Structure formats: C-alpha cells, structure tokens
Amino acid sequence: MRDIEKYYDNTESEKSRNNVKYFVNKIKCHSGKAIELGCGAGNDTVYLIKNNWNVLAIDRESVEERIAKRLNNEELEKFRFQKQNFESLELEKNNLIVANYCLPFCNKNNFKELWNKINDSILKDGYFVGNFFGNNDEWKSTKEEMTFLTKEQVIELFKDFEIIEFKEVEKDGTTGLGKMKHWHIFNVIAKKK
C-alpha cells in the first residue's frame, strides 16, 4: 500500500479539524461557496457540506469516491472534486478557503504564486481557515523543498485580512502515518477586508 493510501485510511474516520469546527460554530458562517485545498480523506469537506456549504474539494490524488461515499444524495449536490496539484492550480471566487496541513507541501519556490492565487480568489468578507509550518518543525531539516515560514511571514500574508484567530503550536505528536515528529504550526482564521 502506498503511504498516501495508508494516510487516507488512517485519517478517514477522524472528525473535522478544530479550526473548521470553530469557524462554523463560533463565527456562525453556515453557507456559501468553499474550496478545500489538499482535502485528503475529506473530513473538513464533509463537515462543511453537512453544515450547508457548497464545497469544491481539491487534491493531487483521486479521493473523490472516498468523500462521496460519506454523503447522501442531497449532500452530493453540494460536492465537487478536482484533481490538481498546486503548481497548476486555478481557483474560482469563493467565500472560504480551507487549507489544513497542505500549504507547507507546496514547493517553496512556488509558494508566493500559490498564495497570490488564494488571496485573489477569496471574496471580500470571505475567510481563510488553515495552517502553515514554522521554522522549528522537524521536517524543515529533511524536506528542503517544502515551505516553512516565520511568524512574521505568516502575519504578512494576511495584510489584506482581519486576523480573527492566530495560534502558534509547538509540540511533539504523530503524523497521519502514525510516526512521531516535532510540529511547529501556525493556525490562522482570517476575514478578507
């Protein structure tokens, strides 16, 4: 079994990420057009659809069936999938971008262009919910092509936004493949001005 398939199997039964639940339940945004980047097993996509969002889920792997089987017929009408990698990504206008544990995997040489596409796609009063890896993340020493940012760099990305939540987390924990690593993460919820 490929590692990516094992990752999807390991994470498919997980609930939506805390930042997405916080966004839906505390900020009280319950409908609109959302895009989930790097959707993986689709936990956030399914949660958003069940909370009345129309979601375009994007991943570089063919995960459409994994997600679709978790939705009823009415919910399927709110679901679209696009197989695409970050380098060729085209984004439609939206009210919400969810990008959990995916943007760091964009090649650092392409990150600025990707971020500009994300920023340009979010409508006024739309939201970004996602995270970035910091320079203290264990993978920085072994995965040179990935994108790692300082706190200041992350904040600078959101100059066109009002930052609603910003949490820096540094801890040891497991990956989706069950391996231990040191995490350094910046979690962000922001509203486009």
Give, region by region, the residue ranges found by the protein language model:
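ABC ATPase nucleotide-binding domain "signature" loop
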Residues: F105
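A conserved beta-strand element that flanks and buttresses the S-adenosyl-L-methionine
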Residues: V98
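A short glycine-rich, Lys/Arg-flanked "PGG" loop and its adjoining helix->strand segment in the class I
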Residues: K112-K124
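Class I (Rossmann-like) S-adenosyl-L-methionine-dependent methyltransferase catalytic domain
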Residues: M1-S31, I35, G40-E90, N109-E113, ...
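Short catalytic micro-motifs in class I SAM-dependent methyltransferases
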Residues: Y101-C102
